[in-house]
From Swiss-Prot:
Gene3D superfamilies named among the record's database cross-references: 2-enoyl-CoA Hydratase, Chain A, domain 1 (3.90.226.10)
Entries under SUPFAM superfamilies matching the protein: ClpP/crotonase
Source organism phylogeny: Bacteria, Pseudomonadati, Chlamydiota, Chlamydiia, Chlamydiales
Protein name: ATP-dependent Clp protease proteolytic subunit 1
Cellular localization per UniProt: Cytoplasm
Key word Transcription present: no
Active site per database record: S91, H116
UniProt GO BP: protein quality control for misfolded or incompletely synthesized proteins
Subunit structure: Fourteen ClpP subunits assemble into 2 heptameric rings which stack back to back to give a disk-like structure with a central cavity, resembling the structure of eukaryotic proteasomes.
Function statement: Cleaves peptides in various proteins in a process that requires ATP hydrolysis. Has a chymotrypsin-like activity. Plays a major role in the degradation of misfolded proteins.
Record-linked PROSITE patterns: CLP_PROTEASE_HIS
Record keywords: Cytoplasm, Hydrolase, Protease, Serine protease
C-alpha cells in the first residue's frame, strides 16, 4: 500500500470512529496528543451536545499539564464521557481514565493500570533557589494527583499516598477492586 493510500485509509478510519463518537488516545500524553484529543472531543460536543462520547485510552502516560488539559476539557463537556482502558493506562494515562463520571469508567479484561507519584525527568540544573521552586511545584502536582485518586476511589488519603509511593501495577480486576474502575468491559455493545 502506497503512503498516500495509507493516509487516506487512516482518514477514513478516523472519520468512521468520530461518527461513532469514539475518541482514541493511544499514545503518550504530550501537548500535541492532548491538543488532538481536545479538538476531537469538542468537535463531537459541538456537533451533537449532550450525546455520549467514548474515550478509549491506551497510554503509558506523560505530561501532567497536558493530561490535566484534557481532563479539564472533558469536565466542561455537556456530553457524558465514558472512559475505556484497553491495553495500558499508566501514570497520567491512569489519571485520564478517571475523568469520566462514576459509573462510566471501564477497562477491557487484559488491560493494566499503573499509578505512581509524579517525577521530573532528565538532569535538573540551577541555583538552590530554583531547585527549591521545582521541588515545591512537584509536591503541589503530587497533591493534585492524590486528590484525583482519592475522589475517584473513595480510598483514604493515606492509602493513596502509600499506593503511589512507588509504581503500583494492577490488572483490570485489581484496579476495579481498588476503585479505579467501575467495571470490566467485554463488548462495546455493553456500553
Amino acid at each position: 500500500m502506497a503512503d498516500g493510500e495509507v493516509h487516506k485509509l487512516r482518514d477514513i478510519i478516523e472519520k468512521e470512529l468520530l461518527e461513532a463518537r469514539r475518541v482514541f488516545f493511544s499514545e503518550p500524553v504530550t501537548e500535541k496528543s492532548a491538543s488532538d484529543a481536545i479538538k476531537k472531543l469538542w468537535y463531537l460536543e459541538l456537533k451533537d451536545p449532550g450525546k455520549p462520547i467514548v474515550f478509549v485510552i491506551n497510554s503509558p502516560g506523560g505530561s501532567v499539564d497536558a493530561g490535566f488539559a484534557v481532563w479539564d476539557q472533558i469536565k466542561m463537556l455537556t456530553s457524558p464521557v465514558t472512559t475505556v482502558v484497553t491495553g495500558l493506562a499508566a501514570s497520567m494515562g491512569s489519571v485520564l481514565s478517571l475523568c469520566a463520571a462514576p459509573g462510566r469508567r471501564f477497562a477491557t479484561p487484559h488491560s493494566r493500570i499503573m499509578i505512581h507519584q509524579p517525577s521530573i525527568g532528565g538532569p535538573i540544573t540551577g541555583q538552590a533557589t530554583d531547585l527549591d521552586i521545582h521541588a515545591r511545584e512537584i509536591l503541589k502536582t503530587k497533591a493534585r494527583i492524590i486528590d484525583v485518586y482519592v475522589e475517584a476511589t473513595n480510598q483514604p488519603r493515606d492509602i493513596i499516598e502509600k499506593a503511589i509511593d512507588r509504581d503500583m501495577w494492577m490488572t483490570a480486576n485489581e484496579a476495579k477492586d481498588f476503585g479505579l474502575l467501575d467495571g470490566i468491559l467485554f463488548s462495546f455493545n455493553d456500553l
